[in-house]
Amino acid sequence: MLSYLKQNLCFYLSSKILILALAISAIVSACTTFYVISLEAKNFSTIIGFLLIDLAIFLILGILLTQKFFSKNNDNDSSRLQNRIVIAFSLVAAIPTIIVSVFSVYFFNLSVKAWFDKKISTVLDQSVIVAETYIAEHKVQLKETALAVAEDLSDMYYDLIHNPALFTKTLNTEADMRSLDEAIVLNKSTNTIVANSYLSFSLSFATIPAHLIKKADLGEPVEVKSDPTKIRMLIKLKEYNDVYLLVGRLVDNKIIDHIDATNGAAAEYNSLKNEIDNIQIKFSIMFIFIALLLLFVAINFGVLFTAQIVKPIKKLVTATDKVKDGDLTVQVPENEVDKDEIGTLYVAFNRMIKQLSRQQRDLVIAQRAMAWSDVAKKVAHEIKNPLTPILLASERLLKKFSAEIKDKSEFESYLKMIIRHTNDIKNIVSEFVLFARLPAPKFTKSELVYLVKHIIEARKLLNDNIVYTCDSNVDQFDFMCDATQINQVMINVLKNAEESIEGQEFGRIDVILDIKDDFINVIVMDNGKGFPPELIGKATESYVTTSSKGMGVGLAIVKRIVEEHCGVLDIANREDKGAIIDIKFDLKELHLKVRRSCG
């Protein structure tokens, strides 16, 4: 039970469903982590927890993928090659990524330190201080001016209180003398303007906050912040009942803009400085995820890429194993690979296997021929010695005692049978001897068309029931060959065709000579019985025959002679009826062979 559960658990753990679920979990966890880091109210314990969860998911996913891949590819040498290539791709992707990540984080920290250097902080702080000092100085000056104007107006109380025109004139004089942009005297009780300078804007107590008026009641100038481009001071006039003086000076807009820009830059700088830890965490996490992503992409690319390389190599390994087991018919599909080095290797492998198969077949045939040659020599030697006396004794018996025998016809029949079978044995022995002692060809120039037609004419005389035809695309052709052996080839081929026609009312043998480029084709077709399908591939082997008159060395001799003349012998059955024998000579190879034999 435990083993069953263990097997199912292993299967489940290595299944594609779990891997897909982990991949989705990794994406969701990464997005959640990024969201948590982006929050303004950060909890670093929570961030670290999410980072650990992300790391665990990625590690488990990587382990499962690696285990699944290597467990699938540990069967043979080609799989181990694929593993090595995938590992190489992973290292090539991981090492530079790690190095770049480390240096990027390092230089990022250096840049951050350079951005938030103490000197820069000091400069920004000093700029803010200078701006604030400028405004503060203007406020102090305006406060002193407000006290001075209030003092002057209090001294002139009895002259001004009942003379509004003089009050206004005096106020304008004070404003011009003290460079005030505005000066206004307000009555709190009536909420009216008692007097004001020429450039002053209309103002009422409703626009002044109550708490500022209370502060002004204490006798000290109070700043009224109603316009960012203007500094105003409110002060109560001592001798007057509920009367207040409001003075103001304009500040240059360029200076205001400069101060605002300085304060904004300083505030943004300090905000970034406070967020630097958050930025560093985001940057580091981003690089970690990019590194992991590149690693997974590299592994997947390595798997796909090596699969394309190793797949044809696996087929080669499989084919090689079959060849090792003795199967020389195996071929790898050349059309399934590109015409590159792998394609060239496929072509070379197929050519090599075909050559090995042909050489093995030729070796078997040669060994069989050599064995039969030895047998032929021994058989010929053992049979030939008693054969001659038997033949001579039979002939003498026929001559000497045929007159004395009462049943003369029967006696002659028996003796003629002995003589006939003895001659058959003699012919068989001659074939043995010819096959065993076939001499090397002696190459001379012979007129091939005449040679073939002459042989056909001779065969016509022996077989008047067979129609012979000869068709040639040239009238004459000088062929470098051993004329005797070529004559023997044609006789054997024609004799084989004649034997297949025996017993038929109508026989036909067609001979075609096709001479073009560097090849000669001699084709012999008949309308006989043809070859049994099971003997098509063995017809040229020694002592394979369907005739009762020979030992089956005729076509074997033909093949040997044709090969000695750099030719190929093909045997097949015609579609309708009969057989076709195609002899093809390669003139280039033949001329090279003749040249080597002469040189």
From Swiss-Prot:
Group of enzyme by EC: transferase
Phosphohistidine, modified sites: 381
Entry keywords, A to Z: ATP-binding, Cell membrane, Kinase, Membrane, Nucleotide-binding, Phosphoprotein, Transferase, Transmembrane, Transmembrane helix, Two-component regulatory system
Domain of life: Bacteria
EC number: 2.7.13.3
GO cellular component: plasma membrane
Keyword Cell wall biogenesis/degradation: no
Membrane-crossing residue ranges in chain numbering: 17-37, 44-64, 85-105, 285-305
InterPro entries in the cross-refs: Bact_Sensor_His_Kinase, HAMP_dom, HATPase_C_sf, His_kinase_dom, HisK_dim/P_dom, HisK_dim/P_sf, NtrY-like_N, Sig_transdc_His_kin-like_C
One MF annotation (Gene Ontology) recorded for this entry: ATP binding
Cellular compartment(s): Cell membrane
Pfam families for the chain: HAMP (PF00672), HATPase_c (PF02518), HisKA (PF00512), NtrY_N (PF19312)
Topology class, membrane: Multi-pass membrane protein
Domain Histidine kinase: from-to ranges: 378-589
Reactions mediated catalytically: ATP + protein L-histidine = ADP + protein N-phospho-L-histidine
Residue ranges occupied by any HAMP domain in the UniProt entry: 307-361
S-S bridge residues: none
KW GTP-binding (keyword) present: no
Family matches, as CDD domains: HAMP, HisKA
PANTHER family for the chain: SENSOR HISTIDINE KINASE CPXA (PTHR45528:SF1)
Stated role: Member of the two-component regulatory system RT0603/RT0550.
The name this protein goes by in its record: Putative sensor histidine kinase NtrY-like
Organism: Rickettsia typhi (strain ATCC VR-144 / Wilmington)
